[in-house]
From Swiss-Prot:
It catalyses: (2R)-2,3-dihydroxy-3-methylbutanoate = 3-methyl-2-oxobutanoate + H2O; (2R,3R)-2,3-dihydroxy-3-methylpentanoate = (S)-3-methyl-2-oxopentanoate + H2O. This is Dihydroxy-acid dehydratase. The active site is at S468 (proton acceptor). Homodimer. Pathway: Amino-acid biosynthesis; L-isoleucine biosynthesis; L-isoleucine from 2-oxobutanoate: step 3/4; Amino-acid biosynthesis; L-valine biosynthesis; L-valine from pyruvate: step 3/4. The gene is ilvD. Binds 1 [2Fe-2S] cluster per subunit. This cluster acts as a Lewis acid cofactor. Its cofactor is [2Fe-2S] cluster; Mg(2+). GO terms for biological process: isoleucine biosynthetic process; L-valine biosynthetic process. [2Fe-2S] cluster binds at C119, C192. Keywords: 2Fe-2S, Amino-acid biosynthesis, Branched-chain amino acid biosynthesis, Iron, Iron-sulfur, Lyase, Magnesium, Metal-binding.
Length: 557
């Protein structure tokens, strides 16, 4: 066993002595040591219940004849961090999580790992670590929260609250109505109830094969999630016995399948960023052109909030992720069904008995929302290395208009609230990319303000930053190269005409190459917003969004 490094042989007497101080007995040294990587944090509703999850996981691991050791990671609640400097720490927290998990697991030579994530950057951070460490691993997420209901019976979620702010600002609802939405938008523990980033990543974790069937859709408060925990411990023991590791599971084909599900469900645009980072950790050469190829062959079968009024509880009721995959498998060339997963079985075996139970929620191949996926990769002279739009969250497929330029999210939100944006405008928020932000903050507050003011179909928004999974409308993010790297978005001037063509996958500014070259020569890189601390180091090391915004290792040659 891998853990023999710290527990076997006469020279490991000091190690065993320390381990006995934690409560271990001599007989425990013949059992696998299992890292229980938890993320219990009281301020994050998606993680507040995970201390109890950790106890259940440890009980299940002991029952399977193994020895559990629990530790915790940090985490950031993107909703609470939204709209202030806290959002700059969100994406960078992914790297801290990955590094901290790597540190604990490799320092103590564990034989296997069970990860208990749930929310936005915590799930991908743990997944990155699992691929980096590459020991047998199973994920059991905390699960989604249920949607809420206002006193009038209206179904609401977190995006409803954000949009309610814009609606109140524009006089569409009263302060009492906003308070009603606030009080009911997040009714319980769990990840926010729509197809936002947390649920998108937990669903992708399931189809990648690192989590068990049901992981993406079973609610946090559903007793079936406890059954998942028991299964996870049993499956981990099988993975250890068969030496099946994350890099055996997360192959190029598995990532294709993850993006196929993403396209079928119209997941968060953040999945592109995180899954490219996973590919990097797995040592795979995977880029945005391959994502675009997946988008072209996968129909959009399922619209979940914010693209519709359906929520994760509805997906679960309709058959869950397995039912969506089973329907997708009917189309040749969409899924790779014979690859291994954390169950110890193939994807084909995992979904064999699944079926759609509500075709209003999960559409059939014969009745898709669209013939192509719910995410699109756009390119053009404004995004030479690519940009991402959640095409399934807008009915507008082509938009052309003049730029209204803001050099930060704060500046943009103030401008929107002051009425500086009107119907037909293209809002540009720049210098918010991985380096420029730094930290590539999400633009949920501006998109929600636009939607709440009733301009969601009449105003486009472009940024080198990110969007929350709760964002909707004509929102194009991840524009690469970013402004801080001298990308075209940095060269735009007030009133320039921008064209967004979703069907043709184009993002263009209507000016000549000669004019762009002239502006590039005149452009001067702004001073970094942050020069010290973690964000200062992050800005120096982070790569572009089109490569997953991972940290580059300095060249010591």
């Amino acid at each position: 066993m891998r853990s023999d490094m710290i527990k076997k042989g006469f020279d490991k007497a000091p190690h065993r002595s320390l381990l006995k101080a934690t409560g271990l007995k001599d007989e425990d040294f013949d059992k696998p040591f299992i890292a229980i990587c938890n993320s219990f944090i009281e301020i994050i509703p998606g993680h507040k219940h995970l201390n109890e999850f950790g106890k259940l996981v440890k009980e299940a691991v002991r029952a399977a004849g193994m020895v559990p050791f629990e530790f915790n990671t940090i985490g950031v609640d993107d909703g609470i961090a939204m709209g202030h400097i806290g959002m700059r720490y969100s994406l960078p927290s992914r790297e801290i999580i990955a590094d901290s998990v790597e540190t604990v697991v490799n320092a103590h030579w564990f034989d296997g790992m069970i990860c208990i994530p749930n929310c936005d950057k915590i799930t991908p951070g743990m997944m990155m670590a699992a691929l980096r460490i590459n020991i047998p691993t199973v994920f059991v997420s905390g699960g989604p929260m249920a949607a809420g209901k206002t006193s009038k019976g209206e179904v609401v979620d977190l995006s409803s609250v954000f949009e309610g702010v814009g609606a109140y600002q524009s006089g569409k609802i009263s302060e009492e109505e906003l308070k009603d939405i606030e009080d009911h938008g997040c009714p319980s523990c769990g990840s926010c109830s729509g197809m936002f980033t947390a649920n998108s990543m937990n669903c992708l974790c399931e189809v990648l094969g690192l989590a068990l069937p049901g992981n993406g859709s079973i609610l946090a408060i559903d007793p079936r999630r406890e059954e998942l925990i028991k299964q996870a411990a049993e499956k981990l023991k099988i993975l250890i016995e068969r030496d099946i590791k994350p890099r055996d599971i997360v192959t190029e084909e598995a990532i294709d399948d993850a993006f196929a599900l993403d396209m079928a469900m119209g997941g968060s645009t953040n999945t592109v960023l995180h899954t490219l980072a996973l590919a990097h950790e797995a040592g795979l050469d995977y880029d945005m052109s391959r994502i675009d190829a997946v988008s072209r062959r996968v129909p959009h079968l399922c619209k979940v909030s914010p693209a519709s009024n359906w929520h994760m509880e509805d997906i679960d009721r309709a058959g869950g992720i397995s039912a969506i995959l089973k329907e997708m498998s009917r189309k040749e060339g969409v899924l790779h069904l014979d690859r291994i997963t954390a169950t110890g079985q193939t994807l084909r075996e995992n979904i064999a008995h699944a079926e759609i139970k509500d075709k209003e929620v999960i559409h059939s191949l014969e009745n898709p929302h669209s013939e192509e996926g719910g995410l699109r990769i756009l390119k053009g002279n404004l995004a030479k290395d690519g940009a991402v739009i959640k095409s399934g969250a807008t009915e507008v497929k082509r938009f052309e208009g003049p730029c209204v330029i803001f050099n930060s999210q704060d500046e943009a939100l103030a401008g929107i609230m002051l009425g500086k944006v009107k119907k037909g405008d293209v809002v540009v928020i720049r210098y918010e990319g991985p380096r420029g932000g730094p930290g590539m903050p999400e633009m949920l507050a501006p998109t929600s303000a636009i939607a709440g003011m009733g301009l969601g179909a009449d105003v486009a928004l472009l940024t080198d930053g990110r969007f929350s999974g709760a964002s909707r409308g004509i929102s194009v993010g991840h524009i690469s190269p970013e402004a801080a790297a001298g990308g075209t978005i940095a060269l735009l001037e007030q009133g320039d005409i921008v064209c967004i063509d979703v069907e043709e996958r184009l993002l263009e500014v209507r000016i000549s190459d000669e004019e762009l070259d002239k502006r590039k020569k005149e452009w001067k890189r702004p001073e970094p917003k942050v020069k010290t601390g973690w964000l200062g180091r992050y800005a120096q090391m982070v790569t572009s969004a089109n490569t997953g915004a991972v940290l580059k290792v300095p060249n010591f040659d």
